[in-house]
Amino acid sequence: MTDKTSLSYKDAGVDIDAGNALVDRIKGVVKQTRRPEVMGGLGGFGALCALPQKYREPILVSGTDGVGTKLRLAMDLKRHDTIGIDLVAMCVNDLVVQGAEPLFFLDYYATGKLDVDTAASVITGIAEGCKQSGCALVGGETAEMPGMYHGEDYDVAGFCVGVVEKSEIIDGSKVQHGDVLVALAASGPHSNGYSLVRKVLEVSKTDPEQFELEGKSLADHLLAPTKIYVKSVLSLIEKVDVHAISHLTGGGFWENIPRVLPEGMQATIDESSWQWPAVFNWLQQAGNVSRYEMYRTFNCGVGMIIVLPAEQADEAVALLNSSGENAWKIGVITQTDAGDAVVIN
């Protein structure tokens, strides 16, 4: 016999009991996201989900995303309750631009040392995002990895699968001269451009919790959860002929709108049709950021753009506003042989 210390996984920095405690904490909120197609509960090796029976030729649409360095800001400010909504929003908004209804969502949560309260707060936010978008949170992975992350830092990633009728896929192929662009207002910077946000905070020596804009702290503006457009857009698709949808994420106006335009089509944006929310004016002024860079990095108050026939634009705006969105006509599509795919006047 030797007198060597008997080591455990916990001695190495992995607390299985904490992981089990987390699962117990989140079971209730996860259950609230359940859809009838989901078979079984948490804890299986894989999640089972049937396809909704209303689809004749169902096409699965998948997506994965994170929340970028907005997470760093949330960790620095110790605000973990809405970052999960951001995570879901970034995934499901990408799915709905193709006309897809989100079915189920999985998350990946990685940290050096698992803090059950923090993780539960994040996952509760994920469940809230799933409820807002009508998809089921069917599982996830919580990875406690000592030595991989500094202090209490963590990272999150999301994975979503949706379904769309094959004949109703929205891919931009129907976009034509004369179509109108309808904008959906953003709730803030959403989940893009936060490395620049943090640089502006640093250079301007601004404390986001002390500095106020329009009666709210800058921190509240910056950490406002990403708007989830799924239910409003799916409802709209049933009533009007949507030709294309663009989710304004990384790359802003210049890169995301061209992704859904056929060759030879140009989107002309009327800059006078809306006012930038105060947070974007502050970012531009405090960081001396050029107009071009603002439109390349941020959504500037526009979270999503829908392209549809001119004769249906007013109806679409009315339908979207009645469903709780702030929508307006922001531009038009013209045919062009040369020039940029997006022009902002």
From Swiss-Prot:
One of its GO terms (biological process) is adenine biosynthetic process. GO terms for cellular component: cytosol. Pathway: Purine metabolism; IMP biosynthesis via de novo pathway; 5-amino-1-(5-phospho-D-ribosyl)imidazole from N(2)-formyl-N(1)-(5-phospho-D-ribosyl)glycinamide: step 2/2. PANTHER family: TRIFUNCTIONAL PURINE BIOSYNTHETIC PROTEIN ADENOSINE-3 (PTHR10520:SF12), TRIFUNCTIONAL PURINE BIOSYNTHETIC PROTEIN ADENOSINE-3-RELATED (PTHR10520). It is found in: Cytoplasm. Pfam families: AIRS (PF00586), AIRS_C (PF02769). GO terms for molecular function: ATP binding; phosphoribosylamine-glycine ligase activity; phosphoribosylformylglycinamidine cyclo-ligase activity. It catalyses: 2-formamido-N(1)-(5-O-phospho-beta-D-ribosyl)acetamidine + ATP = 5-amino-1-(5-phospho-beta-D-ribosyl)imidazole + ADP + phosphate + H(+). This is Phosphoribosylformylglycinamidine cyclo-ligase. Belongs to the AIR synthase family. SUPFAM superfamilies: PurM C-terminal domain-like, PurM N-terminal domain-like. Keywords: ATP-binding, Cytoplasm, Ligase, Nucleotide-binding, Purine biosynthesis. Transmembrane segments: none annotated. Its main location: cytoplasm. Its EC number is 6.3.3.1.
